[in-house]
Amino acid sequence: MLEKDISGYEGEFSELIRQAPTLYRMMTKLLDDPALPRSMSPLVIAAIAYFILPEDIIPEDKFGPVGYVDDIYLCAFVANEVIAASGSPDILVRNWDGLRPVVELVKEILDREKELIGDKRERIMQYIGLDQL
């Protein structure tokens, strides 16, 4: 369904929005990786769940494919936390099936936070109970 939602999208942030299915798959694979620090499981689960919430902070029903920018931002945030907790990006690389290097993608998304989600970071984190981070 996610791939169908973004299929053919060529609008704003399309180069990043096209990464949404791959980021989602990486999050699901991380849950099965025994190297994932246990403390990271709730964050990974939150990122997965956020993709399926119909009325998240930037809802796809209202904004179309550009509504995935908050979902991809959250995945990048969680991926960065996983790197910090595990001490290496290896776990991400091992679970990544995208063409673009995952660490580069995560960095770009985080660097473009304001452009992608504006001032909505705090609301996104509160929505999923991660406002302490």
Give the ranges of each region predicted by the language model.
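Terminal, membrane-proximal amphipathic helices
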Residues: 1-39, 77-133
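A generic alpha-helix surface/boundary motif
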Residues: 24-25, 42-43, 56
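Transmembrane alpha-helical segments and their cytosolic interface motifs
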Residues: 32-52
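Membrane-inserting effector segments that mediate pore formation, membrane fusion
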Residues: 47-75
